[in-house]
Amino acid sequence: VNFIAKQLIAKGVKAIVIACNTATVNAIEQLRAQVNIPIIGVEPAIKPAAKQSISKKVAILATQATSENQRFKDLIDLHHNGAQVLIQPCPGLVEFIEQGKQNSQACNALLRQYIVPLIDEGIDTLVLGCTHYPFVQQQISIIAGQQVNIIETAAPVTVQLTKILLEQKLDASKEQQGQSQFFSSLETKEQEKIFSQLWQEPLILHALAP
């Protein structure tokens, strides 16, 4: 995370969003202490999930690393609001998505393996505790059914980023147009193809300098 942040700062970024729950819980405090630009983290939306759950049974789909992290457990203790919070580690799911196999039968079978037991437990709210998981949100919705509300973190993170940019007078003028650039520690044509598939339009992938 530090390596990536240094690369981005060298390119002139004015804020960084750590768009990864696992990296946020493991590295955000250290990174904030080392850089002088705003760092926004991503954490599972436990608070709104617990607040809106009627059955008071909430589940979080998370990576193995996030599920074992103490900061993550502390967030649950802080925000559960009397709800029972079930944690479901999802080994293998990120790998399917990063390989461009998120629509495969094998990926769908893995999702069923993780989600069906949660439905049987009576949850009515499901938190996507990894920023990869919205890429399979449609499949998750089909498996979970209409009775389960699915929550992910993109919207609140966008609101928080906008708020910080405005507060620190770092927001762009209305005349300025942004641009998208894509960098990866693994820069190959296959990766570029997968990135384009996930982004839903062709893109050029650049390598992060060593």
Outline where the language-model segments fall.
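Non-catalytic structural scaffold of enzyme domains
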Residues: 1-210
